[in-house]
Amino acid sequence: MSKGVTATIIHRLVERGVLAYDEPLATWWPAFAAHGKGNITVRHALSHRAGLPAFKDIAPMAQASLAATGENLENAIPDWAPGASMSYHGLTFGTLLGRTAEAATGRSFAHLLRHEVLDPAGIDDLWCGLPDDPKLHARVATLHAPRDADPSTGIAPITADERAQNSGVARLFNSAEVRAGCMPAAGMIGTARAFARHY
């Protein structure tokens, strides 16, 4: 659900001419161009065709930091030429687009979320980075790992892909540090009503 909200921010910025679908991310985020990434466009990122489907060599908790994941992608080498193939960009989707939006506007992702999506739609209970409020934290559901997960991998037998979410994902997203961080692809927290109002 987070990716759709993030995409809404991007579409609104394109609508106003701040971003353009066929312009490289490096137009606004020059450091991203390193290692042959200078031709990856907003369209490639939105359509999971950027060639960067996963972070490499990043600590789990660092994935909750848009700055840390942005630096990780600046140093990354694409798995394929932009647009040549498609693979689900589970978490990198949010960093590619979130960091680009920040660079293009000079605003934080949380600010863009509030002013581009939430305020115009009258949404109060949705965050990318849960505020430090014990009452809010108490309302967040606890994630549980699949009961039939293989103890050696943490992956349920129904999933064929070894990169599928495992029991470590539940632990990661249950941590206060990750809930307080900004993960535009998967870390938004909100009520069902707030997400429904967006969609």
Q: Regions from the language model: what does each represent?
A:
Residues H35-Y199:
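Short, surface-exposed loop or secondary-structure junction motifs
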Residues Y21-H35, A121:
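Short, glycine/proline-biased beta-turn/loop segments that scaffold the active-site neighborhood
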Residues M1-D22, L97-A101, H198:
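Active-site SXXK
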